[in-house]
Structures are given as C-alpha cells and as structure tokens.
A protein has these predicted regions:
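Bacterial Sec-dependent N-terminal signal peptides
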Residues: 1-24, 250-252
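Extended soluble regions of mature proteins
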Residues: 21-252
Length: 252
C-alpha cells in the first residue's frame, strides 16, 4: 500500500510538471520578414545582365519589403501563417494579395500538413515530418530577449544557405516557414546572407486552442512531399527558361 501511495504521489508530481510545461511552453511568435530584392536577384545565377537591369528598373529604389507572420506553438504541435498585421504602409497604391498559407507540424505523430501556394496553385502537402539536417555551431547571440545558438543548413534545390538561431530556453522543435527540428524554438532565420531575414520581434506565452488547427475550407490539391518537391523543381526549370526569378511565384 505504501509503495502504491508513493507511486501515486510521483504520478501527481509528474502530471503537475507536465501541466506546467504544457502551459508555459505554449504561445505565439510574431516574425518580421524583411525581403531584400537586390540580394535575392544576386543569388539567381541564371539571369542575364539585361534581365537584371530590367527588373532593377521595375523595382526602382524600393529594394526591401517587410511583412509579419505568426507561429502558434505547443510542445506537441505548431502552426505557421501570414499575419493580418501590416509591417509597413503600402505606398505602392495597392495591397498584396494574401495567398493561402498554413504550415502545421505534429511533433508527437511525426507528421506535417501544409497548405502552401505556388504559381497561383494551392497545394495540401501531407506526409511524414522530415526535419532539415542542421549543423549546430557554438556561436551565441540574443534574439527577442533570448540567448540563441546558431545552426546552419543548405537548401540544394533552391540554392539557399540558411543560418538559424534557436532559443535553448524554449526547448521546442518548431520554427518559421518550413524550418523545424532543432532542440529549441527557432527565433531567427537568415537566407542567403540577408536576401530574406526572418526575425522574432514579439513572443506571447499563453495556452493555445484552435489556433493550432488549420483554417476551414481551403481548396487545394493534396500531394505528398516528393510530389510537391517535383512541382517546385518543374516550376523553377520553367522560370529558368523564361529568365524570370523563381521567387516571384513561390515562397523564397
């Protein structure tokens, strides 16, 4: 009887600790995305000088564009989407059309479920979750008030070098865009030396509910990860032939 009582006490303690962890490790992150068109263009190796000059003329002096995104997270699940908040005034006379984006990770089940748009076509990618193969470094820096450790990964399909910074004091695998799999919440990601900088600027810890679920009624073509990768490769090949930047029709 005494052993059962001790076991029960330990069970209550463990449950209490788990409940506390579930509460304290839930919340949302607002990320500021800074797109640098000049650096994005420089990373596209197939454009002729004439194409570069034409595109540079079209964009004029506006080399940067900023937007907000939001990541909702818990120990088991995360979901990432574009934010309703505006990061800057739209001084070009029109608003950017928001396309369906909802990237969901279930870390307990090891699965992903992503609604993502490419070339005006929305895909519903459902498959096993395979995180990026990160290399962790000893470098440290502060992001949004948290001491973060550096990790790197190279996207060989899009030819992007990614530098991520993850918070060791928030031991979750989640991150912005399709990044995940580090031993801490990813608070910053730098793609191709500033071509796209994703940086957390607000973290709110609170219990999550329906925020972790996909929005309803998203029309999309259901595919596996490999099929989506093939679609990316095909689209990039088409853009190469047309001498147009691939990132105009898909997420960078």
């Amino acid at each position: 009887m005494k052993k059962l009582l001790i076991a029960f006490c330990f069970s209550l303690l463990a449950s209490g600790m788990q409940a506390q962890a579930d509460t304290t490790l839930q919340g949302s992150v607002r990320y500021l995305l800074t797109h640098n068109w000049t650096k994005k263009m420089a990373a596209v190796d197939y454009l002729s000088q004439q194409s570069r000059e034409r595109i540079a003329y079209m964009w004029g002096k506006r080399s940067e564009w900023k937007e907000y995104t939001t990541l909702y997270f818990s120990p088991a699940v995360s979901r990432y989407e574009e934010s309703e908040e505006r990061a800057e005034a739209d001084d070009m006379g029109y608003s950017w059309r928001r396309e369906p984006l909802s990237l969901r990770r279930d870390f307990d089940k090891g699965s992903l479920s992503d609604y993502i748009t490419m070339a005006s076509k929305t895909y519903w990618v459902e498959d096993t979750l395979v995180p990026q193969h990160w290399k962790i470094h000893n470098d440290l820096k502060e992001v949004a008030g948290h001491v973060c450790m550096k990790a790197t990964w190279e996207d060989t399909l899009k030819k992007q070098k990614v530098v991520a910074w993850f918070a060791q004091d928030i031991p979750l695998q989640a991150g912005p865009e399709r990044f995940c799999g580090l031993p801490g919440l990813i608070l910053e990601a730098d793609l191709n030396d500033g071509a796209l900088l994703i940086s957390a600027d607000r973290i709110i810890m609170r219990r999550m509910g329906k925020e972790l679920d996909h929005p309803k009624k998203i029309k999309a073509k259901k595919v596996k990860e490999e099929q989506y990768t093939q679609a990316i490769r095909k689209y990039m090949d088409e853009r190469r032939k047309e001498e147009e930047p691939y990132f105009w029709g898909m997420r960078y």
